[in-house]
Amino acid sequence: VKPLTEADIRSSFVNATPDELAQLPIPGLHEMLWGDREFLGWRDPQAARRGYIVSWIDDRAVGIVVRSAGGSLRPGIAAMCSFCHSPQPATQVRLFSAARAGESGRNGNTIGTYICEDLGCSMLIRTAPPHLNPPATIAMRGEALLQRVQNFTADIMKTA
């Protein structure tokens, strides 16, 4: 992902309330390995169910606020993240919902999908043994991940 500044992040959110923006925690941007990320995703340390996802769409940073469901999937079964398509224990995948942008979202309309609980999909697609993930495979998985994140974000931005 192209590096993001705090100003990029704060101005990017399409479905955040003024209160959410005022309380928005910014992750340690100086620690980011931008070349190893397709999007920036993080959880709010003060609001355990809240998370944030920022990606670039057509040279514009677009951010969405997501909320995890209160419960989790049943332990002992496998689940798959709809972003990175990585199968993993069900306890590591969570249903997240996001309010639609604009009046539609203010009226309570949301969209949900299953995502890695820590929003660390960019790292997960890179954590297989090297012989199973040559650079070309990682690039292909990264492009597919970014496309799915952008599609979900575009759905959030639809107001009808």
How would you label these PLM feature ranges?
Residues 1-62:
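Charge-rich, low-complexity N-terminal segments
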Residues 56-70, 96-102:
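Short Cys/His-rich Zn2+-coordinating modules
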Residues 66-77, 106-110:
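Short, flexible, mixed-charge glycine/proline-rich loop motifs
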Residues 81-85, 116:
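Short cysteine-rich clusters marking metal-coordination/redox-active sites
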Residues 86-90, 121, 126, 130:
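Short functional micro-motifs and their immediate structural scaffolds
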Residues 97-113:
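Short linker/helix segments within small regulatory modules
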Residues 113-120:
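Cysteine-rich micro-motifs
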Residues 126-159:
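Polybasic, low-complexity binding patches
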